[in-house]
UniProtKB/Swiss-Prot annotation:
Keywords: Cytoplasm. It is found in: Cytoplasm. InterPro entries: Rickettsia_antigen_120kDa (IPR020954). The gene is sca4. The lineage of its organism: Bacteria, Pseudomonadati, Pseudomonadota, Alphaproteobacteria, Rickettsiales. Pfam families: 120_Rick_ant. One of its GO terms (cellular component) is cytoplasm. This is Antigenic heat-stable 120 kDa protein. Residues 1-69 are annotated as: Disordered. Residues 12-21 have a biased composition (Acidic residues). Its main location: cytoplasm.
Length: 998
């Protein structure tokens, strides 16, 4: 279980081993070419032992047997080589996480718990078995670097186990392929009888292939994948025929039902260990993680995402549960993380379960996911008498070497000097460049595959090449680069060890007297390339530090050293690494270059500019990621989301990044908001909040505010969403701008910026005009609203202090620019006007607006936008009345109570595009209708029965059904009534609730 959950469960290369042995018995032939051998199902069977085995382990459950107990050799090997190393790595990561934990008391408690248990039990069984620690384990497993370490442990560990326990390698009862009978096409059934080496039957496996029920699942990135064919194997639960231990490993199938190549294969494995009576017992299940099921029913098939592809496993949910019960029975306690199948992990939509039509959403997976990347493995160098058998189809061309050259390993087995003699003789004899590269690769691979003095021997080989006078300088560059490529592809040498070799190679080449600076730079750049391909950031950082140190310590001139450091920086800058890591690596190179006075001021400036660009890009991405998190946070309501995104907006405005990056960031944030699945009112509120945050910023220059508003509207206009939604969000932005009443002139400029933002999009002219009209309409509404608020409580006939009225006159002058001519504009030469004149003019303007408000607003609308067909207040009222009548009429067409309730919910509560006034008027009309209907029913003597009086509360209800007396009684009573009183009450209640919610 658990991190036995890997894809390399022990069987993927069975056929490879067999064919390897076969080939070794043949005469020397042409070199073996890489093949696309498909993976196959495998099994192993170990005869009964004289000692009883123990329950199998479960990685994180604390069920590992004690050291003095003897277990099945394969399980024991997995335990020691893979699982314990993984647990140590996980524990280390948890300790790192605890160091950063805010709750210091809890962190210290957990740290002590781990440290103290380590002293008693290196396996940390209790810690990993405690459900309370699940959160710490899950958090650790989310770290990409830890995942890579765990995967690396598994790859190396399983590789060793496969070699040791393969039947093809002579291990008695070792792994071999399952031989299925020919498939019976009519029913898609096939079977096989599994036998041990003595020919005794162990069990019969039945396999059913399903091609008639395709279903769709979603990958992590949201991509939908259709599964057209999958299979289910009836794994045995009890084995009572032959004694011993057995391991069944079934390869996962691709989405089309075919088997993958061996270098991509993953497996579902059942481990049956010898029990007290000698018979195999099901004690362990290994599978890749996270394991998911295509539905909730017993026939739902298991599947996983691995290396970006979807694979189905040969087990159904029902069979898996059955197997897990048996595992629990023999282990005596629950199984670990990998075996948990919480009901909420799968979500089925569309057709019913029987038709297997689920959609599994990407976030519904176990956090403790461990997936192994596809790896390219370099084959070991074998003596010349044996042809090479390459294991994967992805071997670089340079690895396919002529077998006649393969004497390097034999030479190295005598001494390093013999190897050098062999290489030098070959280089002198062979003038073909490719053959020379093959020869050097062979020697380098022999060194890397030999654990003894690996690093020292590698340095000796590099020196030999650089100083070999038989090679031209350009040839030396090609040969050294080929050796560096061999280092890169070697899977058996840890990255930290490789980094030392890179440092040494750079030092040797830079100090060489017979290479030009350009040739030295080419080799340096290749070394950096190899370093940047390392699996984890620590190894990469160590290697870059080593290479930087080698440049600084070299005998190059200061100028050439500076050029080399810039070359290192350029390689890092152009890499695919994260911005955060680029910052770290570039910063380190720059710091050392400055401290040692190697980098010139110009070079320092160039590297600093690259760093600044990365920092800006990182800041932008961080802000965008933060907004995505806010939008997706289920704990945040709209108010909280708006406040949080306002904070992000302010943070962007205050950050030291360039105006260009600020604009891109604000545009991206707005576009994400606009395209989010939130309802349009929520999105409008958030955009309004962004507008307010920009307009009300107190220290920002007006020109920068204007540019920021333009970027936000560009994000709205460019978003892929409905035009009506864009119009509402544009209005929201204008509302946000008007929330700040500090400077009407700046407000006016920001309104122009909204238009520019619209123009930045690629929308059709009609849509652009519609957005601009929406902005104008919102601006006019806000200006009118501000006037109305200013008029409240004013008695314009009473004298007011000069300042109060003068200020109001100024406000109106700004707001009605190009619309109303004020005393200030009419008399530019007459700045010294009397208080009375100002008061009279202002009073006149305010009176005009307040007395004939409707007329003024209509005129203002027409003057502000004569071409944009804005509606007058009367037109809006008429439209509203018409809409109310339509809604009331449509409600009348709904016959059942359920339909009427649905109508109320959809049209009067959920539909935010309708104004509050329309919805409230509709509710009032419908309430009047319902009250009228009820009144008519009461007044009509023909239907005024005793039953009706019972419902009216004039006599007591008598129970009819003990289960639901009131409901049954009501049904009986109103069945005789022309107006269904109960339903009438329901509808009135629903309408009143709707009114309250508005």
């Amino acid at each position: 279980g658990g991190f036995m959950s890997q894809d390399h469960t022990g069987y993927e290369n069975d056929e490879g081993y067999e064919s390897d042995i076969d080939e070794k018995t043949q005469e020397q032939a042409a070199p073996a070419q890489p093949t696309l051998d498909t993976a196959d199902d495998g099994f192993s069977f170990t005869p009964a032992s004289s000692t009883q085995s123990t329950p199998a382990i479960s990685t994180l459950s604390g069920t590992i047997s004690t050291d003095d107990q003897i277990s099945d050799p394969i399980t024991k090997a997995v335990r020691e080589i893979i699982i314990q190393q993984q647990k140590d790595e996980i524990a280390e990561q948890i300790l790192k996480d605890l160091a950063a934990l805010v709750d210091r008391d809890l962190a210290e408690q957990k740290r002590k718990e781990i440290e103290e248990e380590k002293e008693k039990d290196k396996k940390l069984s209790v810690f990993f078995g405690n459900p309370a620690n699940r959160e710490f384990i899950d958090n650790a497993l989310e770290k990409p670097e830890l995942k890579k370490k765990l995967e690396s442990i598994e790859i190396t560990g399983y590789k060793n186990i496969l070699l040791t326990y393969s039947a093809a390698n002579g291990y008695h009862g070792g792994f071999k392929p399952v031989q299925w009978e020919n498939q019976i096409s009519a029913s898609d059934l096939r079977a096989t009888v599994v036998k041990n080496d003595a020919g005794d039957e162990l069990c019969t496996l039945n396999e059913t292939t399903v091609k008639t029920k395709p279903f769709t699942v979603a990958k992590k990135d949201g991509t939908q994948v259709q599964i057209n064919s999958y299979r289910a194997i009836d794994f045995p639960i009890k084995l009572d025929k032959a004694d011993g231990s057995m391991h069944l490993s079934m390869v996962a199938l691709k989405a089309d039902g075919t088997k993958p190549s061996k270098d991509r294969a993953v497996y579902f494995t059942a481990h049956y260990e010898e029990g007290p009576n000698g018979k195999p017992q099901l004690k362990e299940i290994s599978s890749p993680q996270p394991l998911k099921f295509a539905g909730d029913g017993p026939d739902a098939v298991a599947y996983i995402e691995h290396g970006g592809e979807i694979y189905t496993l040969a087990v159904t949910r029902g069979k898996y549960k059955e197997m897990m019960k048996e595992v629990e029975l023999h282990q005596g306690q629950s199984v670990d993380l990998s075996q948990i199948i919480a009901e909420d992990l799968t979500k089925v939509q569309g057709r019913s379960q029987e038709t297997l039509q689920p959609i599994i959403t990407p976030n519904q997976e176990l956090k403790s996911s461990i997936e192994t990347p596809t790896t390219t493995q370099v084959p070991p160098i074998t003596p010349a008498s044996q042809p090479v058998h390459t294991e994967t189809s992805q071997m670089p061309q340079s690895q396919q070497v002529n077998p006649n050259l393969f004497n390097a390993a034999t030479a190295l087995s005598c001494s390093m000097q013999d190897l050098l003699n062999y290489v030098n003789a070959g280089l002198t004899k062979e003038k073909d460049g490719n053959t020379q590269i093959d020869l050097i690769n062979e020697a380098a691979t022999a060194i890397l595959n030999n654990e003894k003095e690996k690093q020292a021997n590698f340095i000796t080989l590099t020196k030999n090449m650089v100083n070999n006078n038989a090679l031209t300088p350009d040839t030396k560059v090609a040969r050294v680069n080929a050796v560096l490529e061999t280092i890169k592809n070697n899977q058996d040498t840890p990255d930290i060890e490789k980094s030392k070799m890179l440092e040494a190679t750079v030092a040797i080449t830079l100090n060489s007297e017979n290479l030009t600076p350009k040739q030295k730079q080419q080799m340096l750049e290749k070394a950096v390339d190899v370093d940047l391909s390392f699996k984890d950031d620590t190894s990469r950082a160590v290697a870059i530090d080593g290479i930087t140190g080698a440049v600084i310590k070299s005998n190059l001139s200061t100028k050439d050293k500076g050029t080399m450091l810039i070359a290192v920086g350029d390689k890092v800058n152009a890499s695919e690494l994260s911005n955060a890591e680029k910052q770290q690596l570039l910063g380190s190179v720059l710091k050392k270059g400055v401290e040692t006075k190697i980098l010139s001021p110009e070079q320092q400036q160039l590297m600093q500019q690259n760093l600044d660009k990365i920092t800006a890009e990182q800041t932008k991405n961080d802000n965008i990621t933060e907004v995505q998190g806010i939008l997706a946070n289920p704990a945040f309501n709209t108010i909280a989301k708006t406040a949080a995104i306002q904070k992000v907006t302010t943070k962007v405005l205050d950050s030291p990044i360039t105006a260009e990056i600020k604009g891109e960031t604000l545009e991206s944030i707005t576009k994400i908001v606009a395209e989010s699945p939130l309802n349009v009112q929520d999105k409008t509120d958030i955009v309004k909040g962004m507008g307010e945050a920009i307009a009300s910023h107190r220290t920002m220059a007006p020109t920068k505010k204007i540019a920021a508003i333009e970027s936000v509207e560009t994000g709205v206009a460019k978003s892929i969403t409905d035009l009506e939604d864009k119009k509402l969000m544009t209005k929201g932005l204008v509302d946000g701008i008007y929330e700040d009443k500090a400077n009407p002139e700046i407000t006016s400029e920001m309104m122009k910026a909204v238009s520019k933002g619209v123009d930045n999009s690629t929308a059709i002219p009609e849509d652009k005009q519609a957005l601009k009209d929406a902005a104008s309409e919102a601006a006019l509404d806000r200006a009118t609203q501000n006037f109305t608020e200013g008029l409240k409580g004013q008695n314009l006939d009473e004298p007011k202090p000069r300042d109060d009225i003068y200020n109001k006159a100024q406000d109106i002058a700004y707001a009605l620019k190009n619309v109303v001519t004020t005393v200030l504009d009419a008399n530019p030469e007459k700045r010294e006007v009397s208080e009375e004149e100002v008061m009279n003019k202002t009073s006149s303007i305010l009176n005009d607006i307040s007395k004939i408000a409707i007329e003024k607003v209509n005129n203002l609308r027409a003057m502000l936008s004569p071409d944009s067909n804005l509606k007058t207040l009367e037109e809006k009222k008429a439209e509203a009345t018409k809409k109310v009548d339509e809604l009331v009429k449509e409600f009348g067409t709904k016959s059942s109570t359920e339909e009427q309730q649905s109508f109320i919910q959809a049209n009067l509560i959920d539909d935010k595009t309708l104004s509050k006034e329309v919805r409230l008027q509709t509710i009032d009309k419908l309430l009047q209708e319902q009250a009228q209907k009820r009144a008519e029913a009461i007044k009509n003597p023909n239907v005024k029965t005793e039953d009706l009086r019972v419902v009216s509360g004039q006599s007591a209800l008598k129970p009819i059904s003990n289960d639901e007396p009131d409901i049954e009684k009501t049904k009986m009573v109103v069945g005789r009534d022309r107006v269904n009183i109960k339903d009438n009450i329901k509808i009135m209640g629903a309408l009143m609730n709707a009114r309250d919610s508005i």
